[in-house]
UniProtKB/Swiss-Prot annotation:
Alphabetical keyword list: Electron transport, Heme, Iron, Membrane, Metal-binding, Mitochondrion, Mitochondrion inner membrane, Respiratory chain, Transmembrane, Transmembrane helix, Transport, Ubiquinone
Topology with respect to the bilayer: Multi-pass membrane protein
Cofactor (UniProt): heme b
Species, as recorded: Anopheles quadrimaculatus (Common malaria mosquito)
Binding site for a ubiquinone: H202
Sites where the protein binds heme b b562: H84, H183
Stated name of the protein: Cytochrome b
Entry-linked InterPro entries: Cyt_b/b6_C, Cyt_b/b6_C_sf, Cyt_b/b6_N, Cytb/b6-like_sf, Cytochrome_b, Cytochrome_b_C_euk/bac, Cytochrome_b_N_euk/bac, Di-haem_cyt_TM
Purpose of the protein: Component of the ubiquinol-cytochrome c reductase complex (complex III or cytochrome b-c1 complex) that is part of the mitochondrial respiratory chain. The b-c1 complex mediates electron transfer from ubiquinol to cytochrome c. Contributes to the generation of a proton gradient across the mitochondrial membrane that is then used for ATP synthesis.
GO molecular function: metal ion binding; ubiquinol-cytochrome-c reductase activity
Note accompanying the cofactor annotation: Binds 2 heme b groups non-covalently.
Length: 378
């Protein structure tokens, strides 16, 4: 019997099994759209970044002016730059919603998929930070100085590590060159990890809103979810383009439109909005090493979720108390983002410390609350 080429060709069949004939649960909701949206965001960032790299100069004397040149002189360069900068914000917004969906529906029980996802999150945050340094404005320079200086908290090796990353005794030309190099290569590593992430996901199959085994109720990915994803792409691009044209510099720091000056410190040093929750947690710990550990743990704690899982049913949709706790956690993370942008003074310091305790307590209380609810059902 004749088989279509998509099933017989050694290369096309791989794409076919991942995008066309892939068996998918029939009831997955719009929350499952964010995976494909993240792939779209990554493609957008790689393409815009590639064209920006053609005109960018990774040198402290010319970096700021080269960004200025891209926006003023390069044909549609302003659009590329704003697409790349705001695309990063939208990338992180989708990333946080993707992780939030994984926590809510307990998709972390697919251990390998979850672990690669957390590694991707770490790498994406590193890439975002490196990109923030490249325009070489005031916030770029001081952000790079402050964040890289955190490594000096590592016992014995601290200062050696910092100087190794700087390539000297201060943030200088060498630092900018290597940051640009890593910022360029990391998205391709993320792309490779994304393939591994999908490979692990397709071995187990997707989770679904009911948290049940859906092997008896699978439908082909194409056309059902291809069209659903395309609709998601259209909505995403519409929001992004509207945002770019109306609020193009809203998410950027005004300080970064001033060339870097090592002799003048900005009043308030802060990273981009998508790091502010972690930055607030870092500042909440009075000890430097403790702050760095808390900063890493704010993301790494996601890795313990598969091991603390204690509920009989899969997903918080069956646990009303856990739902309240989850949405409380969303509010806490949002407030931490706000606190991270505030100056280090009362009442913000105390508020940040309370929110940090609430953030980490979620991961302790959640499994206990699920166990309590299961006990009530018995």
């Amino acid at each position: 019997m004749f088989k279509p080429i998509r099933k017989t060709h050694p290369l096309i069949s791989i794409a076919n099994n991942a995008l066309v004939d892939l068996p998918a649960p029939s009831n997955i909701s719009a929350w499952w759209n964010f995976g494909s949206l993240l792939g779209l965001c990554l493609m957008l960032q790689i393409l815009t970044g590639l064209f920006l790299a053609m005109h960018y100069a990774a040198d402290i004397e010319t970096a700021f002016n080269s960004v200025n040149h891209i926006c003023r002189d390069v044909n549609n360069g302003w659009f590329l730059r704003i697409c790349h900068a705001n695309g990063a914000s939208f990338f992180f917004a989708c990333l946080f919603m993707h992780v939030g969906r994984g926590v809510y529906y307990e998709s972390y029980l697919y251990h390998m998929t979850w672990n690669t996802g957390v590694i991707i999150l770490f790498l994406t945050m590193a890439t975002g930070f490196l990109g923030y340094v490249l325009p070489w404005g005031q916030m770029s320079f001081w952000g790079a100085t402050v964040i890289t200086n955190l490594l000096s908290a590592v016992p014995y090796l601290g200062m050696d590590l910092v100087q190794w990353i700087w390539g000297g005794f201060a943030v200088d030309n060498t630092t900018l060159t290597r940051f640009f190099t890593f910022h360029f290569i990391f998205p391709f590593i993320i792309l490779a990890l994304m393939m591994i992430h999908l490979l692990f996901l397709h071995q187990t199959g997707s989770n679904n809103p009911l948290g049940l085994n859906s092997n008896v109720d699978k439908i082909p990915f194409h056309p059902y979810f291809i069209y659903k994803d395309i609709f998601g792409f259209i909505v995403f691009y519409w929001i992004l383009i509207r945002f770019i044209w109306k609020f193009n510099y809203l998410l950027m720091d005004p300080e970064n439109f001033i060339p870097a000056n090592p002799l003048v410190t900005p009043v308030h040093i802060q990273p981009e909005w998508y790091f502010l929750f972690a930055y607030a947690i870092l500042r909440s710990i009075p000890n430097k090493l403790g702050g760095v550990i808390a900063l890493v743990l704010s993301i790494a704690i996601l890795l313990i979720l598969p091991f603390t899982h204690s509920s009989k049913f899969r997903g918080l949709q069956f646990y009303p108390l856990n739902q309240i706790l989850f949405w409380n956690m969303v509010v806490v993370a949002s407030l931490l983002t706000w606190i991270g942008a505030r100056p280090v003074e009362d009442p913000y310091v105390l508020t940040g410390q309370i929110l940090t305790v609430l953030y980490f307590s979620y991961f302790i209380i959640n499994p206990l609350l699920a166990k309590y609810w299961d006990k009530l059902l018995n």
